[in-house]
């Protein structure tokens, strides 16, 4: 702002020099600032082109000029700038020296300058850096900032040192006494004991009397047999033998021969005589005979009887539907029919128990204690059920698992149809059961088996394992229409 005011003052001085071109030896003019107590002349309006927003008050206060000391021809230029009403206050004497304070002063030079905006000057050089200001007072502490987002998860810390060993816990409550174990099998015969120690040496006999040479005596009788030696101590227990190799699976048994034809059943009782049938309908009339040859003309006879009825005419059109007749009365109950022949329903069922615990793996389990097997379809020797009647069957098992895990599979048509397992160790006891419906054809076989190291099926005085199956309905009855 100060630079702009100085530039306007320089332009004003140059304009005044052009007006007074006749005086070649014009001294430098001097300006004095008007006192601040004087008001701005009425009608004096500064150019709006030099004002900025917020600076109008400053320009208004500095618009008044200093009082002249003497009159001069230069008054014309001052009057043309300030207006007609400014002549009473502002008068500039010719060639008088005055001073001008440009601080807060803006000169309106609209009448002496061109209205065309001048070109923008080049930016000035950057001034030197000013001295460092004094350190300001410490500001009041700011408000606490908002909580920042959660930082990334830190790296896993190093493993801590091992803690001290804790005190020994109190002893647990003694458990219930276990069930008595089964009697073990007879062990193998022990090795032959070592020879017992020799007996003590007998006392020395008395010296015999010296005699002459005698003849050789005969051979004496054999001495009595000595006493048996002491029984040797039992030998050390031999090492446990290794597990035998897996046996080969047996071939399927041959199909049994067809059974003999059963004896003919007893003849049924003769049925009662039926009721007399209703009277039959009348038969249709016969066709007329062929016409005979014409005979000789006879005498005129008497009027004969009417001739035969001619043949029936063609069938007429279908008549309209008649009205429905009334409902007839309920007929009387018929006579009871004769007793029919009884049909034999095919049957097949079995139920068997396991007699030894922990059956061998990967082979049919032999449930050899038969409870029911009238048709003989289940074989306790092979542990397999042989289907003789095709149809839909129901199979079930309920087994006890103890001491080791068990994996049970139900096999039908040489394929595992169902698999289940029980995980037990120690002396734990549990039960497993199954109910399954299967459709079988004649000759199909069904059995149960366990896997290696998963054969924990158990039987005992208080525990049983059972396998059962029966025919639900044969295939023939299922295919018949009602």
UniProtKB/Swiss-Prot annotation:
Keyword Ligase: no
Free-text note regarding domains: The C1q domain mediates calcium-binding.
PTM summary: Not N-glycosylated.
Entry protein name: Otolin-1
A Pfam entry, by short name: C1q
Sugar attachment sites: 189, 315
Residue positions, PTM 5-hydroxylysine: 189, 315
Organism: Mus musculus
Ranges of biased composition (kind: Low complexity): 137-153
Biological role stated in the UniProt entry: Collagen-like protein specifically expressed in the inner ear, which provides an organic scaffold for otoconia, a calcium carbonate structure in the saccule and utricle of the ear. Acts as a scaffold for biomineralization: sequesters calcium and forms interconnecting fibrils between otoconia that are incorporated into the calcium crystal structure. Together with OC90, modulates calcite crystal morphology and growth kinetics.
Biased composition (Basic and acidic residues): 155-167, 236-284
Sites bearing Hydroxyproline, chain numbering: 141, 144, 174, 177, 180, 222, 234, 288, 306
Domain Collagen-like: 130-189, 217-276, 283-342
Annotated signal sequence range: 1-23
Expression sites by tissue: Expressed in the organic matrix of otoconia (at protein level). Expressed in neonatal sensory epithelium of vestibular utricle and saccule and also in otoconia.
Keyword tags: Calcium, Collagen, Disulfide bond, Extracellular matrix, Glycoprotein, Hydroxylation, Metal-binding, Repeat, Secreted, Signal
Subunit structure: Homooligomer; disulfide-linked; probably forms homotrimers. Interacts with OC90. Interacts with CBLN1.
UniProt-listed GO biological process terms: otolith mineralization; protein homooligomerization
Region (Disordered), start-end ranges: 120-344
Keyword flag Phosphoprotein: no
GO molecular function terms listed in the Swiss-Prot or TrEMBL record: calcium ion binding
């Amino acid at each position: 702002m100060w630079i702009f005011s100085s530039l306007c003052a320089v332009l004003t001085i140059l304009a005044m020099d052009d007006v007074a071109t006749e005086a070649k030896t014009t001294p430098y003019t001097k300006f004095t600032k008007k006192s601040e107590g004087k008001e701005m002349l009425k009608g004096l309006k500064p150019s709006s082109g030099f004002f900025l927003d917020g600076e109008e008050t400053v320009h208004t206060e500095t618009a008044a000029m200093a009082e002249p000391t003497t009159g001069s021809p230069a008054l014309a230029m001052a009057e043309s700038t300030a207006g007609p009403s400014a002549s009473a206050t502002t008068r500039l004497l010719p060639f008088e020296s005055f001073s001008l304070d440009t601080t807060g002063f803006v000169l309106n030079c609209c009448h002496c300058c061109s209205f065309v905006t001048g070109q923008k000057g080049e930016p000035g050089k950057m001034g030197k850096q000013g001295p460092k200001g004094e350190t300001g007072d410490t500001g009041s502490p700011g408000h606490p900032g908002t909580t920042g987002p959660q930082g990334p998860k830190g790296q896993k810390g190093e493993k801590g040192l091992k803690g001290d060993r804790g005190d020994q816990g109190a002893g647990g409550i003694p458990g219930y006494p276990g069930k008595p174990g089964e009697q073990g099998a007879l062990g193998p015969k022990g090795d032959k004991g070592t020879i017992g120690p020799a007996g003590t040496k007998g006392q020395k006999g008395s010296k015999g009397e010296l005699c002459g040479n005698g003849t050789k005596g005969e051979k004496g009788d054999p001495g009595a047999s000595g006493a048996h030696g002491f029984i040797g101590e039992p030998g050390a227990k031999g090492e446990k033998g290794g597990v035998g190799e897996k046996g080969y699976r047996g071939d399927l048994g041959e199909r049994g021969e067809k059974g003999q034809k059963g004896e003919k059943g007893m003849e049924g009782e003769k049925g009662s005589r039926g009721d007399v049938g209703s009277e039959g309908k009348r038969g249709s009339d016969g066709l007329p005979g062929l016409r005979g040859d014409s005979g000789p003309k006879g005498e005129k006879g008497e009027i004969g009887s009417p001739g035969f009825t001619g043949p029936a005419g063609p069938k007429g059109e279908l008549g309209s539907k008649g009205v429905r007749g009334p409902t007839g009365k309920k007929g009387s109950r018929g006579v009871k029919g004769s007793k029919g022949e009884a049909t034999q329903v095919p049957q097949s069922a079995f139920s068997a128990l396991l007699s030894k615990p922990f059956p061998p793996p990967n082979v049919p389990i032999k449930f050899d204690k038969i409870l029911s097997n009238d048709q003989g379809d289940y074989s306790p020797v092979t542990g397999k059920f042989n289907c003789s009647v095709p149809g839909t069957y129901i199979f079930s098992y309920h087994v006890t698992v103890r001491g080791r895990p068990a994996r049970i599979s139900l096999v039908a048509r040489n394929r595992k149809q169902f698999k289940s397992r029980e995980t037990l160790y120690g002396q734990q006891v549990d039960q497993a059961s199954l109910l399954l419906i299967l459709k079988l054809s004649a000759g199909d076989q069904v059995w149960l088996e366990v896997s290696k190291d998963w054969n924990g099926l158990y039987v005992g005085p208080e525990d049983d394992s059972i396998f059962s199956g029966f025919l639900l309905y044969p295939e023939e009855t299922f295919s018949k229409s009602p």
